[in-house]
Each structure stands twice: as C-alpha cells, then as structure tokens.
Regions:
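Hydrophobic alpha-helical interaction segments
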Residues: 124-250
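An N-terminal domain-start capping segment
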Residues: 1-26, 105-106, 122-125, 129-137, ...
Length: 250
C-alpha cells in the first residue's frame, strides 16, 4: 500500500501528517479509512491515530509517544515524567500531559490521558518522538503540586531515585514560578536529599534567601498527617520525610 511504510515510521500521526505524504486531503482521508478497516491503525481520539503491529494487532507507540502527539506543543509532565525516567515506585495508568492548548481527557489502550494546563515552555526536552520535562523541571513541578506526583510518600521515593541534578537549572527555573513557598519546599528537599542530588550548597542557600517569615504547610496532605515544623525553612513538612531523609539538625 502506497505511503504505508512512511506512516509506519510515524507510529502516531494525524490527518495533517498524512496530507503531507499524499499532497491531497481527500486522498489522505481515504488512506486513513482504508488503514482503519484493515486494522493497520487504531483511532486514539479525534484526528489522532496509532500504527499497529499487523501480526499482534497491538499499538506500536507507547503512552509517551502518544501523549507527545496530542497537541503540537504537548509534553509528558509530573509523575508521568518520573515514570518516563524510570524512577516510579507505583504503577500509574494516568498519563499527565501538559500543553497550552486544552484537550478533553480520554482513555486509550489501558491509559487515561489527563490534561494539565501549563503556561511555561522551559525545561522540556525532545527524545526521539517524546517530549518530556527534564529532571530539574520535573522535580520542581512535582514538589509544587504533590497531588500530581502521587502524594508525599510517592514523591519522596521518586526523588530518592532521580539521581544527580543541575542546581543552576533549578534556580533558573524557580524564577519563573516566583513563589516563596516553592523556594522553601524545593530548598528543603534539596538539603534533605542532597547526597543523591549532588547540588552545590550555594544553590540550597540561595533558596533559603528567597523565603520570608511566613510559615507554609508543604501541602494539604501534610495538614492531615503527622508533621513537623522546620524553622530553617519556615515549613511544616510530613514526618515521613524526616524518617527517611538525611539526618540533619534544623
């Protein structure tokens, strides 16, 4: 079938992609209908298709490739980025997809694709057909919105596994959020887990300089569970963080 080999290379595609191959929208629509009828492709959602393995009738693309194609600026974020980097503790079947262009949540092939609005376009890397937040942006976003990171314990376990981080990137990214609470939360976690992160102590100190005298709870979950006040960071944190992290004297 003409153009099938090129479509196979795309793995995930929309009508515009096929139009670029056929140079004719009607031909493109006919080709998509034919491929659907042969079970060579599956419809993911309106105007989004995934190529199938002909023998097993299973989709070739993984959830990350699909998510990255939902919108022209969409990318993997929050816990799904942890998942992409292989540092998850629990298996999640929700794929968090950030974009400036809203789409309706949908499910496909065992995964729920959930839209997360984003006004930022920094800290995003392209790996083949996948767009995903880099590790530094991922940890900031997940610390900022722990509910999208699987909760406090899941966040902590993922941070333990994420590995080395670029402290300069973290400070650069934090400026965009302009949040004293986030400086406190990120600075606290960097200090607590810096044996693994390996960031310069000056980065942690810079975070501390950015906070004021106001006291913050780490998140809403912290209010409901055992917690402890850390005066250095003006932060009330989950007690589970302190039983697992470095022994520090605040």
């Amino acid at each position: 079938m003409k153009n099938y080999e090129k479509i196979l290379e795309l793995k995930v595609f929309n009508l515009q992609d096929v139009c670029e191959l056929t140079d004719n929208i009607n031909t493109a629509k006919s080709l998509i209908r034919a491929l659907l009828s042969l079970n060579y492709i599956k419809r993911v959602k309106h105007n989004l298709y995934a190529v199938c393995n002909i023998e097993f009738k299973s989709v070739i693309a993984d959830q990350y490739m699909i998510a990255s194609k939902i919108k022209d600026d969409s990318y993997i974020s929050y816990h799904s980025a942890f998942d992409y980097y292989g540092v998850k503790n629990q298996m999640f079947y929700t794929v968090y997809v950030s974009s400036k262009k809203r789409f309706a949540d949908f499910d496909f092939d065992g995964y729920d694709y959930s839209f997360v609005n984003s006004k930022y376009d920094f800290g995003i890397v392209q790996n083949g057909k996948v767009r995903v937040t880099d590790k530094e942006r991922t940890i900031i976003d997940c610390i900022n919105k722990t509910e999208l990171a699987g909760g406090d314990e899941e966040l902590f376990l993922c941070l333990e596994l994420i590995g080395k981080l670029d402290g300069k990137k973290i400070l650069k990214y934090l400026k965009h959020y302009n949040s004293q609470k986030l400086y406190a939360k990120v600075g606290f976690m960097l200090e607590l887990l810096n044996d693994g992160f390996g960031v310069d102590e000056k980065v942690i100190e810079e975070c501390r300089k950015r906070i004021n005298g106001r006291t913050y709870y780490f998140d809403n979950e912290t209010k409901k569970n055992k917690n402890k006040y850390i005066s250095k960071w003006n932060l009330v944190v989950p007690e589970i963080f302190l039983t697992r992290g470095r022994t520090l004297h605040w």
